[in-house]
C-alpha cells in the first residue's frame, strides 16, 4: 500500500500521461516535443531518435527537471494539425481555400520563366549572309529545355554553318549513330565559320532570339551555354539563401522581396545591350525566382491538413505544366525575344497584391513561439471564416493567452547538423533529387540523339511537346502510385525504374552490338549490323522515355517528401537544400554542352551508380503519409524508420516502438522496500529457509 501511494503521488506530481500512441513511427506533434522533459530519457531504446538538449536557464545553467515542463510551450499549441487547424475550420474554411488558390496562380508564371530558355536561347540553323536559306546546312542544334542534340545531316559544298559545335555525318548511311560534335574551329567547321554575318532560321516561332541578336555562333557559341547556366546558378543560390531567410524572418517578407526584385531584374533583362549583361541579369532573375518558388511551396504545404497536402501540391505542378504547354503559343504571339521576356515577367505584378491579401504562415508563427502575432492572425482568420469562439472545444485561445509572454524562438537550418536522424533524411533526399534531375538529361540527350532516324523528333515542337508530355504522364502516375504505396514506396518504385532504364541502356545495347560483330558471312554481317542498329535505336528510345518518366517523378517526389519531414521551424531551409541539389543536377546539362559533350558517357555512368545507392538509402526514410507535419526539431527526430511492409497481426516486431516500451520507473521503490525488510523475510513476506 505504501508503494502504491508513493507511485500515485509521483504520478500526480509529475503530471504523467499515458504513453502516446504511435503511428508509422512518429509521435503526434506536441507529444514528441515534450517527451524528453516529461519522461527523462524517453525512447532511449528507439533505433532512430534523439532528444532535445535541455533549455538554458536565464542565469546560464540548465533548468532543473522540475522546471523543464514549465519551460516547454503548451502541447496543445504545438499540435497544430490536431488542435489549431480544426478550430479554424481546416481546409473547409473559405479563407483557407482562397489562400490555396492564390498559391496555384503564380505557378503558371513560374512555368513560363522556367521554360523560357528553350525559346530565348535556342540555337537556330544559320548560314552565311547572302547565301540564301535554300543552301542552309542543318547541323547539330540545341533544342528543348535540356539542351538536347539532333538534326545531323550531310555537309554541303558551300561555306555555311549551323552551331559551331555541331558536326556532320553522312545522311545516306542511316545505320551510323550520329557522332559527338567536334569543338569549334576544328575539322570541317573551319570553313563554316569564316563568315562575318549570318542569316538565321529560328525554329521556336520567334523572329529574333538572343543567339541571333548577338551572333552567338562559332567562336561565341560557348556564351549560349554560359547564359543557360546563369539562370540555374541563380536558382541554386536563391534556394539556399532565401530558404534560410524565410525561416528567420518569415515566408511573407521573402515572397514580397522576391516579387519586387524579379520585376526589376526580369524587365531589365529585356533591355540588355550585350550577352554579358543578359547573363548577369538572368542570374539575379533566377535568384528571385527561387525565392518565389520556395516560399509558395512552403506556404502551400503549411496551409493544408495531412490528407490534402499531396494533391494540392500536384495541382500546382499541373498549373506549372500548363505554362510549359502554353509557352510555344506565347512565343509565336510575341515574335521577339524582348517582348516575350517582358510578357513572362509582367504577370508577377499581380503578386504585389499578396502583401495585403496573403497573411504570414500561422503554422510558422506558432512553431517559432510568436504567440502575440499568432493570436492576432487567429482572430483575423476566425472572423474571415465566421468561426464562433464557442467552437474552440480544445481551448486553444485560453492556452494561447497563457503563452503570450514567451519570447520568439527561431532556428536556422545549420542546427540540423546536431541531430541524429533528421540530417540523414535530408541528405538522402538531396542525393535523390540530384540524381533524378541529373540523369534526366542523360535520357533526354539519348532520345534526341536519334532524331536523324526518327523524323518526328526533327521538329522543335515535337521535341518540346514530347518532353512536356512525358513530364505530365509522370505526374499523373505519381498521383496513383503515391496514393497506394505512400511517399517512400512510390519514391522507391520510381528510383528502381530509373536504375533499370539506365543500366539496360548502358549495358544491354552494348551487348547487342558486341554479338552482332561476329557473323559467318558478309551477307550476315550486313544483316546483323542493320538489325543491330535498328534494335538498338528502338530499345534506346524506349529506355530513354521510361528513364525520363521515372526520373522526373523521383525529383518531384524528393522535394515534396522533404517538405513533409522537415520541421516547420527549418522547413524552408530544408526545401532550399533539396531544390538546390535539383538545380545542381540540371546544371550538368549546360556544363557538358559547354565542353562539347566530352565526358557525357562517364556522366551517365556516375548517375547510374547513384541510382543504385539511392535505392538502398530510400529504405532508411520514414513514411509521412497522413502524418502531422513536425513543428520543431524534436518532432522531426521522431519521424523514425519503419518496415516497408507492416508485420502481420499477432507478430511481435523485433524492435519495440516507444508506445510499447515498458515503464520500469517504480523499480527503485521496490528495491528500497526490500532493503528495509528483515534478513529472514523477502519482499512478499515469505520466510527464508
From Swiss-Prot:
Expressed in many tissues, including brain, spinal cord, kidney, liver, eye, adipose tissue, lung, epididymis, adrenal gland, pineal gland, skeletal muscle, heart, spleen, thymus, ovary, uterus, testis and epididymis. InterPro entries: MFS_sugar_transport-like, MFS_trans_sf, Sugar_transporter_CS. Residues 165-177 have a biased composition (Polar residues). Glycans are attached at residues 24, 274. It is found in: Membrane. The keyword Membrane applies. GO terms for biological process: monoatomic ion transport. The chain crosses the membrane at residues 229-249, 253-273, 283-303, 310-330, 339-359, 462-482, 489-509, 541-561, 572-592, 601-621. Belongs to the major facilitator (TC 2.A.1) superfamily. Organic cation transporter (TC 2.A.1.19) family. It comes from Rattus norvegicus. SUPFAM superfamilies: MFS general substrate transporter. GO terms for molecular function: transmembrane transporter activity. One of its GO terms (cellular component) is membrane. The keyword Membrane applies. Its main location: membrane. It is a multi-pass membrane protein. This is Solute carrier family 22 member 23. Residues 1-55, 162-188 are annotated as: Disordered. Keywords: Glycoprotein, Ion transport, Membrane, Transmembrane, Transmembrane helix, Transport.
